[in-house]
Amino acid sequence: KMLSGNEAVARGAWEAGVAVASAYPGTPSTEILENFGRYPNVYAEWAPNEKVALDTAIGAAYAGKRALATMKHVGLNVAADSLMYAAYTGAEAGLVIASADDPAMHSSQNEQDNRVFAKLARIPCLEPSDSQQAKDLTVAAFDLSERFDTPVLLRLTTRICHSQSAVELGERAEPGDGTPKPFVRNIPKYVMVPGNAIKRHPVIEQRILDIAKLAETFPYNVIEPGDPALGIITAGVAYQYAKEVFPTASVLRLGMTWPLPAGLIRQFAASVERLIVIEELDPFIEEAVRLLGLKVEGKAIFPLLGELDPRVVRESAIRAGLLPAEARVPLPEVDPGALPPRPPVLCPGCPHRSSFYVLNKLKVPVNGDIGCYTLGLLHPLNAIHTTGCMGASIGVAHGAVKAGSPERHVAVIGDSTFFHSGIPALVNVVYNHSPVITIIMDNRVTGMTGHQGNPVNGQTLQGGQNQEIELEPLVRAIGIKHVRTVEAFDVKAVEKALKEYLALDEPAVLITREACALLPEARKRWVPLEVIADKCNGCTLCFRIGCPAILKSDELDERMQRPKALIDAGLCTGCEVCAQICPRDAITFRPEAE
């Protein structure tokens, strides 16, 4: 069956008998849990953040059930504390962390190589190079976890996650007899006070040495003999590129990239004249091979930055003399002007647009966060001035205030991100009395990753409906005295609240609430607007909200000599933000909608 890498990991987890899986959605890993949750006899959940997801998986594994935690690469930063203690404790049942790196930062704020976490934690790292291996190595990861009493890191990358290839399916294997096991009270193993942890450290050091011995015969570490003039060590999707560009070369394909099989690498190196490593991002394998005392080339030839592809590998090889210039594959001629530019933009009817319009109007420093609303930085809204990572907005605003910044700082954060890591930062604002204004943009869903449920709507991954957690009572319980919830599309209400908060010298929270325009309940309300051409004078004010549905018409206003506005009825959702800011009442609902 044709499966994406994410679908294959989900299938592998199900075949391996995984009972519990937890994740926070993040591209390119999101679809793993979405697909796993559709299988029978499993429990799958969206957690508020990746640390909670990993702790959940650890708890399930302590209780004797195989467990999986999935996340994108930066999610493992959030979960790192839990990863490190789990490396010390091990578990009663298999525990696997699937972490998806994002070379070229297609949807991420950085480009880190998470194989280093395996080395840091002294745990094995497996790295599939196609969908079949994604499934098979997931199964192998759970077997490895239980054999050596260790968490296992499954390192994926964007192209493995989202590319499809043929996968041979197997059946589910239920570990044991399937009956629930009582919790095992093993204090020296599971209670990481210093006296116990100091005894566990030698255990994990010996464990990684034992796994290194296994790596020599690990069935997914394979030498593919070829022309001895060139030997290539590679892993992950880079294997596919290596085989395409160097079809006759000798190849060592690594399915376990930590610990590395030192003996197998030496054997392979001795059989070739020139040894190179082709890998995405850091020179992780290359440096380990060099530490073995072997002559090897890697990042001196192939890029350190961005993702690889056959063209990049081929061009790099030509420059290094590994291939003749005749090997260059000419690219088809493309007219750069053949396609119009398509910059990212907030959707028509996005409930965040009005807030950014007001923030731009008020000219205040705005600290952004991770989500659809990051697009508020773009012209013509121009209303985001910092963005770092999940939950950073409130803390960064607080720091700027405490550094003596004379302006009032605003933090904008989405509902899902607030639950992810914004709550501790808001507690800090109250505790250390910082007059930060926080806008929680509540669009009732985790939007950017594909409309996953979260605590604000109570929708579970497997289709259930649990209790909704209300933002306003939560914020008041933290100690914020000035809290207000307004309709996100009500421009006057947003502006009035922000002006009142700017006059205060205390922390304040504004919750702007409206369902994401792409949710079914919002789509039912879509009724397009139109511009009354006779009233429009081309003032361009409506263009400043950056709505894709508002266009420049061919008709010029005689006095202003500017194009009048035109609304695309096929895009307009009828949010009325443009109508509210039009000074001439030139925007109204279409007659057929009334």
How would you describe each model-predicted region?
Residues K1-N6, A16, P128-L346, P351-S355, ...:
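Flexible, low-complexity linker and terminal segments
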